[in-house]
């Protein structure tokens, strides 16, 4: 009798845990779809407490952190997702974008930290391209990261300035932008960014 009672009690605990996890996940999903990313974070964090390996909840949590502009936590969430599912292409993409935002918009960020973030973003976009070479937004975002890195390394600041690396990054940026523009000739925004990259490369080559 005691064994039956214990089994029933444990079963009820498992069912309650699964129900709580599903409820929080569904509430988080609804908030996400409604564009209320901060509320989505609250619910999805609870879902992760119930099951820290829930890939769907983890993806939505990283996505919600990103759109709530909590880029550091977004990077951490997508990093965990990648450790559980290395083939999740979108996780690399959003982690790369989060790192790019951190590099460019973190107040008083050190140049050394900005450099690390941009290089990490480039690696993330490159990995996304390895997994799905047909999605042009990966090339576009890698081009932007290459551009930002090239401009950073072109600054004549001790222990930062590196003309060869700056030129290499800007050339890579141009190649990626050209690929996007060839597939979408009407993209004036890409054409403008491409010309800016060419101009920066020309200026750096004269330094």
Could you tell me what each predicted segment is?
Residues 21-24, 55-56, 89-90, 136-137, ...:
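Helix-start (N-cap) detector for alpha-helical repeat units in TPR-like alpha-solenoids
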Residues 22-23, 27, 155-207:
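Terminal, low-structured helical/coil segments at or just beyond the last alpha-helical repeat
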Residues 33-34, 67-68, 101-108, 148-151, ...:
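Register position in tetratricopeptide repeats
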Residues 46-47, 80-81, 127-128, 180:
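Canonical positions in the second alpha-helix
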């Amino acid at each position: 009798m005691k064994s039956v009672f214990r089994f029933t009690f444990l079963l009820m605990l498992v069912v309650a845990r699964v129900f709580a996890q599903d409820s929080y996940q569904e509430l988080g999903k609804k908030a996400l779809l409604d564009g209320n990313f901060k509320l989505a974070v609250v619910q999805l964090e609870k879902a992760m407490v119930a099951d820290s390996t829930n890939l769907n909840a983890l993806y939505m949590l990283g996505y919600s952190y990103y759109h709530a502009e909590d880029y550091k936590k977004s990077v951490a969430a997508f990093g965990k997702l990648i450790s559980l599912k290395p083939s999740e292409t979108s996780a690399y993409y959003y982690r790369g974008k989060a790192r790019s935002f951190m590099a460019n918009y973190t107040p008083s960020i050190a140049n050394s930290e900005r450099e690390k973030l941009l290089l990490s973003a480039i690696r993330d976009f490159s990995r996304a391209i390895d997994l799905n070479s047909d999605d042009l937004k990966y090339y576009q975002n890698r081009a932007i990261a290459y551009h930002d890195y090239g401009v950073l390394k072109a600054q004549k600041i001790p222990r930062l300035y590196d003309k060869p690396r700056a030129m290499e990054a800007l050339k890579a940026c141009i190649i990626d932008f050209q690929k996007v523009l060839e597939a979408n000739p009407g993209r004036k925004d890409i054409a403008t960014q491409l010309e800016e990259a060419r101009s920066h490369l020309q200026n750096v080559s004269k330094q």
